């Protein structure tokens, strides 16, 4: 899935590219991509550090969304399959 498709799926209104939901979805796509890369290249510690930074950033944004709009948080979690 490319960036434009992700934005279209998670945007709230037309032209929305920076909402919390879109940011979480884009970070999740990058995290999945880096995870696959690290399975092939386990000693790539530079990329591993980048992955940890992305995971931390996504965690903070998810926490913000959970406090701001719990219903939207549940929808995003369900769409992305992040938690139970």
From Swiss-Prot:
A Gene Ontology BP annotation from the UniProt entry: translation
One Pfam family hit = Ribosomal_S15
InterPro entries, sorted: Ribosomal_uS15 (IPR000589), Ribosomal_uS15_bac-type (IPR005290), uS15_NS1_RNA-bd_sf (IPR009068)
Q: Does the keyword Transcription regulation apply?
A: no
Q: What functional role does this protein have? A: One of the primary rRNA binding proteins, it binds directly to 16S rRNA where it helps nucleate assembly of the platform of the 30S subunit by binding and bridging several RNA helices of the 16S rRNA.
Show the SMART domains listed in the entry.
Ribosomal_S15
Return the protein name.
Answer: Small ribosomal subunit protein uS15
Its Gene Ontology cellular component terms are: cytosolic small ribosomal subunit
Give the matching SUPFAM superfamilies: S15/NS1 RNA-binding domain
Question: What residue stretch is flagged as signal peptide?
Answer: none
Task: List GO molecular-function terms, semicolon-separated.
Answer: rRNA binding; structural constituent of ribosome
Subunit structure comment from the entry: Part of the 30S ribosomal subunit. Forms a bridge to the 50S subunit in the 70S ribosome, contacting the 23S rRNA.
Alphabetized PANTHER family for the sequence: RIBOSOMAL PROTEIN S15, BACTERIAL AND ORGANELLAR (PTHR23321), SMALL RIBOSOMAL SUBUNIT PROTEIN US15M (PTHR23321:SF26)
Swiss-Prot/TrEMBL keywords: Ribonucleoprotein, Ribosomal protein, RNA-binding, rRNA-binding
Can you tell me which family this protein belongs to?
Belongs to the universal ribosomal protein uS15 family.
